[in-house]
Amino acid sequence: GRGFLHSHSYTGNALACRAALAVLDVFRDDGVVAANAATADRWRALAAPLARHPRVRHFRQRGMILAVDVETTRPDFARWFFAEALARELLLRPIGHTVYLMPPYVTTDDDFALAVARTAEILDQA
């Protein structure tokens, strides 16, 4: 049979490729990866209240992305949690009973600690 041919609008686009290379230069020259690793270490300590929360069954972190599995009987947990987070000015990603925290690189330690505290408040009600 015939194969399905699929391509993207920007495949091989010279401007897009140059922009990507410039970003890689910034990552190398400005020490972005090392800075993110240091931030991830600080955030691991700041996230300790989530790791210890009685509703959290599995806390994990990969770099600057954190996730917790939540023990709850709410059948609509993800929808409920998302609404509660928005009400507290948080944009978090619950999928099923797992909540992901993926803050942008520009997040300060104080803002991250506030997000952790607000997430714990929501978990108190779960």
Residue ranges of each PLM-predicted region?
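Conserved N-terminal phosphate-binding loop of PLP-dependent enzymes in the Aspartate aminotransferase
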Residues: G1-A126
